[in-house]
From Swiss-Prot:
It holds the Pfam family HD. Signal peptide: none annotated. GO terms for molecular function: dGTPase activity. Transmembrane segments: none annotated. It comes from Mycoplasma genitalium (strain ATCC 33530 / DSM 19775 / NCTC 10195 / G37) (Mycoplasmoides genitalium). This is Uncharacterized protein MG461. SUPFAM superfamilies: HD-domain/PDEase-like (SSF109604). Disruption phenotype: Probably essential, it was not disrupted in a global transposon mutagenesis study. GO terms for biological process: dGTP catabolic process. Residues 55-181 form the HD domain.
Amino acid sequence: MQQTFFKDPILGEIIFDENTKWMYELVNTKAFQRLRNIKQLGINFHFYPSGVHTRYAHSLGVYELIRRILNSSAFLNIDQIKKQTVLVAGLLHDLGHGPHSHAFEIYFAKNPDFKKQLFIHEKVTSMLVNSEPIVSILKANKIDPNLIGALIDENQNIQPINWWMRQLISSDLDTDRMDYLLRDAYFTGTSHSLVDYQSIINGMECVDNQGTYEIVFQEKCLPFIENFLITRHHMYQSIYSDGRSIATELNLWFVFQRIKALIEEDNFNFHNFKNVESVIKPLLKNQLFKKSLLTCFVKLDDYVFHSFLVNTFETTKDAILKTLLDSYLNTLKFQVKFYESCEKRDLDFELKVKEYQTPSYFITKFNNQFKGFYEGWNKHKNELKIKTSQNKIKNLSEISMLVKRSNELFFENSFYRWANVFYQN
């Protein structure tokens, strides 16, 4: 097989070379091809019309960033199988996303803060990795599918995962975040995401720390790392936690709360959407997603899901469900109001809830949890490490006053934005 490459507006070229050409088999599986029809930003494209890029392109981008990192001189001493394991984990890390990406996990949670999720995309990804044909492709190339699953789903605690492997897949400065910040900013037209990923890669070192390898960053990388963290913070403020996106996601949460009630009354018809029914009906009955549903799941994407919602809107005779779907499919009628405190929010909620005949479908409290500016501070051993000019390894929060002060400011002002989400005609 000749070298295969994709042209990419973010990274220039994505290459499957002599060492990774077998991974192109994974790209051609149905589970991976499905990602062509899963939008990276979920339902945010409603408000960012050009933000229709896909999990497919993002997954290829993560793979390419890892490939470039592992081809650098810093990783010459790393075992080839370990390198390929991390590459595969990066390539496959998003296989388990449902339609609308992260929002799908909210729709079937018991409450809108989704503290208890019935569908967790990392676990579904691990199931797909351990299913045919992917599992056979991995084993034929001496890659342990369980290790891939453990790299993607952090709750699977198996050995031997070196810390450097986890750092590239899931950390405060991982390849997933590098790619999605660049890609999301480009396709939404957001100008404040100027991540200098090449300078960050150039400043990486893989060092032996008491028998296990870990990634450290040269001190000259500090401005680029700080900029990366600032960029992510701003992207959450301006795009990922946009109030309109929250309102739209909660609109659909209400839709599925109503569908759930109609199913319990034996008064809902999925019509010909049997794969949708097979996947979401157990979730609406508060059952965890099971591996036996994977065959149906890989047939679900944004387009199938949208067709199901449109068909339901056109055929339902239930006035509440029709009103909720009209808001989602046509003109969004749900709004988000943020408050300075939980007490003020609750007081306003008690007044506003009286305006609705069936309030459980039209108004809810919502605690919007902020993403920390830098999360390494609360898991001290997992902090980003900086190699100083004196060759000492220190935690990022010791070196960067920006990181230290930003976290202090962040936690002084609380983890949450208290909100009410409600229908306003």
